[in-house]
């Protein structure tokens, strides 16, 4: 009953309120991730190319993993996380971020180029794919939009509460610990690999357990001098990692019903942190790390959201250097001393990237030039201005894609293009006039007079003689009496009467 009420409230709130904070809160402590097993299965993943950027990156590969979970039909249902993935893809295309390999995990199979459902098993598998066989010069991008949660800290934890990433099947399979996220995605990165991670979920400030963070309250001024601080003395990595999170470890992130007020060209539901971060990417060309970060906070504060985005990194970033999604991080000289010496050594490019050669994709792979994701127009670059997050590495914009194969004991996954169906107009049947039957006059029956029976006189029976009546019987003359004739007698009777 409680679950049904929670589901009903979540659906009604999503449809009525301007934004919803639907937090899961605490979850049971999940089981640990088998990192070795996950890395052994990473080669099974089949990435795609989401779009073709005008200026490809030639210093290495650009791999991206997008995860959006709406938890449809559950008490934890959200409304805009799948939309966040689409919006992030569109934003990266507009700034010409040249993704060469991409996987998309969303709980909507209708999503273009859907890769897999975001279950716990799949999320772990594709996280391993993201960092599998990476080399110096490779660039990684990770985006998660969904639920974050807290769980009681373990015996080996330095915190009272650990943070968790919540997969689609968390109620059966459990969540994913922040300790495991670091072990799986960050710890093994080689020097020269750059990763940018964006978490739009609750309790997300330290989901990667990075050692350096920008520590400042909600009302910090942009006019002050800001620096990263060391927040833990372990979890170092040779890779260069920058993480943007939607809120503090104890905070929550909002799911917005209508995102049109952010000015990004979207109107559907979405995460407030994703909207603010993408707005900063699109509107702060050439700005520094601190400018991008403070703009993200300012957008949310002006719109009345209570969440405070956070910034953390694997190394002490100089916040006043120009922001980029590429290349090594420029470190703050005053904080480098806190890093062990092995993590600050310079790195050399991978031999496969030192002399890039022209490589073309097979003819069977479709990569239409400037084909936008879901029909969003590609940002124009005819004015010659550079786009944030894109670096040509000193090369002309006419460079070609990096090699698709690299000499290694572990072959890199085969590069595969984002499937684009052949351009085809809607079916038009052959032009044909409506059927015109042959012209015919209305049926005219043959002219006939009304039926005239043959003229015939009334029936006249043939005349015939009727039998003549029998002749009257003849009177037989009675014989006279013997004696005298009558006349004679009468003759004498007319005299004198006689006597009787």
Swiss-Prot record:
Protein name per UniProt: Metacaspase-5
Which PANTHER family does UniProt cross-reference here? METACASPASE-1 (PTHR48104:SF30), METACASPASE-4 (PTHR48104)
UniProt-annotated catalytic positions? 147, 202
Read off the SUPFAM superfamilies from this record. Answer: Caspase-like
Q: Supply the source organism for this entry.
A: Trypanosoma brucei brucei
What GO MF annotations does this protein's record show? cysteine-type endopeptidase activity; metal ion binding
Q: Quick one: which residues bind Ca(2+)?
A: 162, 178-179, 209
Encoding gene (name): MCA5
Highest taxon of the source? Eukaryota
What keyword terms does UniProt attach to this protein? Calcium, Endosome, Glycoprotein, Hydrolase, Metal-binding, Protease, Signal, Thiol protease
């Amino acid at each position: 009953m409680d679950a049904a009420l929670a589901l009903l409230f979540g659906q009604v709130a999503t449809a009525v309120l301007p934004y919803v904070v639907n937090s899961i809160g605490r979850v049971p402590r999940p089981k640990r991730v088998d990192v070795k097993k996950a890395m052994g299965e990473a080669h099974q993943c089949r990435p795609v190319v989401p779009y073709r950027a005008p200026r490809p990156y030639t210093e290495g590969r650009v791999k991206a993993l997008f995860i959006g979970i709406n938890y449809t039909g559950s008490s934890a249902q959200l409304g805009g996380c799948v939309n966040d993935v689409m919006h992030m893809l569109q934003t990266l295309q507009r700034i010409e971020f040249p993704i060469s390999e991409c996987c998309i995990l969303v709980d909507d199979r209708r999503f273009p180029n859907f890769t897999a459902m975001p279950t716990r098993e799949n999320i772990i598998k594709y996280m391993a794919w993201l960092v599998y066989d990476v080399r110096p010069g490779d660039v990684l991008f990770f985006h998660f939009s969904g639920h974050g949660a807290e769980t009681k800290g373990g015996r080996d934890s330095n915190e009272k509460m650990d943070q968790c990433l919540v997969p689609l099947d968390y109620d059966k399979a459990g969540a994913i610990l922040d300790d495991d996220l670091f072990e799986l995605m960050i710890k093994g990165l080689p020097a020269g690999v750059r990763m940018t991670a964006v978490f739009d979920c609750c309790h997300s400030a330290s989901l990667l357990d990075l050692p350096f963070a920008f520590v400042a309250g909600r009302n910090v001024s942009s006019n002050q001098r800001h620096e990263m601080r060391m927040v833990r003395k372990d979890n170092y990595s040779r890779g260069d990692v920058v993480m943007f999170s939607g809120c503090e470890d104890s905070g929550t992130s909002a799911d917005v019903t209508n995102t049109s007020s952010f000015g990004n060209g979207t109107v559907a539901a979405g995460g407030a942190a994703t909207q603010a971060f993408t707005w900063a990417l699109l509107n702060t060309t050439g700005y520094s790390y601190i400018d991008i970060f403070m703009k993200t906070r300012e957008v949310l504060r002006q719109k009345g959201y209570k969440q405070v985005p956070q910034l953390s990194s694997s190394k002490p970033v100089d916040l006043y250097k120009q922001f980029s999604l590429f290349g090594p991080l420029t470190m703050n000289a005053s904080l480098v001393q806190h890093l062990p010496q092995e993590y600050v050594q310079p790195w050399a490019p991978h031999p496969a990237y030192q002399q890039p050669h022209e490589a073309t994709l097979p003819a069977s792979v479709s990569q239409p030039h400037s084909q936008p994701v879901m029909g969003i127009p590609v940002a124009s670059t005819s004015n010659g201005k550079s786009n944030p997050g894109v670096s040509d590495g000193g090369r002309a914009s006419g460079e070609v894609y990096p090699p698709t194969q690299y000499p290694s004991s572990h072959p890199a996954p085969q590069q595969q293009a984002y499937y684009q169906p052949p351009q085809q107009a809607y079916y038009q049947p052959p032009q044909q006039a409506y059927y015109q039957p042959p012209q015919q006059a209305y049926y005219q029956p043959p002219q006939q007079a009304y039926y005239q029976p043959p003229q015939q006189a009334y029936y006249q029976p043939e005349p015939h003689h009727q039998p003549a009546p029998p002749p009257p019987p003849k009177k037989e003359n009675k014989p006279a009496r013997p004696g005298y004739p009558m006349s004679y007698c009468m003759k004498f009777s007319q005299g004198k009467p006689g006597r009787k």
